[in-house]
């Protein structure tokens, strides 16, 4: 759905990760599973499914970056796999903090500022200097 609604890479990446963080925030039990907490005594099948989920998400993010290279003529500052890995690691880290805080520190807290920081070094300078692509800026101008 996000891929069909957004044509530009930055909003697509942001909305995809924000969807993950928002879902985790609204579903603490799933957050534990995504973080690996609830998997200690679980079957290998569940552990495998979580790994597959993250692999598929990473593949989708890589596709967004590759599409940006083709359709928007922008490239990340490092190889796509490396660039996407840091985005996913940031989102996973936010979920981990949420679980460790006993669900007192929402994964979306301060995400917009962190997103701006991540994007500042993500794409080559021509895009990194255009923070207006952020959903936070779009939403704040609407209010």
Where are these regions (language model features)?
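A short alpha-helix capping/helix-coil boundary motif
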Residues: 1, 41-45, 93
């Amino acid at each position: 759905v996000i891929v069909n609604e957004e044509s530009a890479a930055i909003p697509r990446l942001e909305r995809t990760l924000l969807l993950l963080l928002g879902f985790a925030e609204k579903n603490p039990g799933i957050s534990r599973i995504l973080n690996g907490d609830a998997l200690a005594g679980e079957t290998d099948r569940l552990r495998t499914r979580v790994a597959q989920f993250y692999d598929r998400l990473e593949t989708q993010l890589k596709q967004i970056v590759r599409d940006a290279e083709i359709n928007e003529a922008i490239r990340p500052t490092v190889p796509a796999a490396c660039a996407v890995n840091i985005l996913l690691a940031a989102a996973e880290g936010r979920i981990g903090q949420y679980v460790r805080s006993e669900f007192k520190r929402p994964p979306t807290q301060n995400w917009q500022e962190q997103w701006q920081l991540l994007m500042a070094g993500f794409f080559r300078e021509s895009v990194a200097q255009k923070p207006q692509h952020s959903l936070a800026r779009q939403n704040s101008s609407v209010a």
